[in-house]
Amino acid sequence: MTGGVGKEELRRFYSEDFVPRMPPDTKLTPVSRTIGTDQLVDEMIFSFTHTEEMPWMLPGIKPTNRAVKIPLVAIVHFRDGKLAHEHIYWDQASVLKQIGLLSDPALPVVGAEAAAKVSQTI
C-alpha cells in the first residue's frame, strides 16, 4: 500500500514518488469506479515495463526491463471538497514475480494471470 494522508504527505507523494516515477509505457485500464459523497474507488489494470526506479512500488529495486501487469485499487478520500488521502493497493508478490525477484514455484503467486482474470470483467 502506498499513498499519503494530509496535505504535505500527498504533495510529496505526487510530486516526488508517484507522478515523476512512471515508466513511459505505463498504461492504466479502468475496470470499475465507485463514487460516494466523499470517496472514490478505482479498480484498474496497471501495466508498465520496469525501465526506471519506482520508489512508490519497488523501493530500492533497479530497473529490470521486464513487463508487469497487475490489478490495482486506488481509494481517494475527500474532506471539505479537498483531497484528504489516497491509498493504493496491489499484489506485491505478483509484481516481484514478474520482474524476476520471486521465482519459487511452490509459492502461491499468480503474477500476470491475476490481471488477465480481472480484465475478463471489462
Where are these regions (language model features)?
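C-terminal and inter-domain tail/linker signature
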Residues: 1-122
